[in-house]
Amino acid sequence: MMTSKRILVADDSDTSRGVLAKFVAQRDFDVCEAVDGEDTIEKARKLKPDLILLDVAMPHTNGIVAASVLKDLLPNVRIVLFTMYTEAIARAFPRTGLAADAVISKGDGMEKLEECVQSLLR
């Protein structure tokens, strides 16, 4: 029997986090949630997820910093920045220097997110 992949959903918005967690759970992934960057790092350390859906604009530790820390802690974890700030991220972080496997705009919708998640977890 194949164990389901674990996805950590990190967003400081209860609404966004809830929608993402439900979306992930409906696709038979094991889902856990984090409310900010520090919580994400702590939970990732304990739970060792296969993939982290990470908002960028979060309190305490933002998603960019958290992604870098997470890649150091868990080099094999896949990280998707799911954010409204894709253009700013593209300008600020050329292809090198961003510790995320993908950046998806919240405006692109769930279909694109699902394609990205499925691709990264193959």
Label every PLM stretch briefly.
Residues 1-6, 110-122:
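Non-catalytic signal-transmission and effector/linker regions of two-component phosphorelay proteins
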Residues 10-11, 34, 52:
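Conserved sequence signature across two-component system core domains
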Residues 14-32:
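Two-component/phosphorelay signaling modules centered on CheY-like receiver
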Residues 36-39, 62-66:
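Acidic catalytic/metal-coordinating carboxylates
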Residues 47-53:
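Active-site beta3 strand of CheY-like receiver
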Residues 58:
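Receiver (REC) domain active-site loop signature in two-component systems and cognate sites
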Residues 65, 86-115:
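Alpha4 helix (beta4-alpha4-beta5 surface) of REC/receiver domains from two-component response regulators
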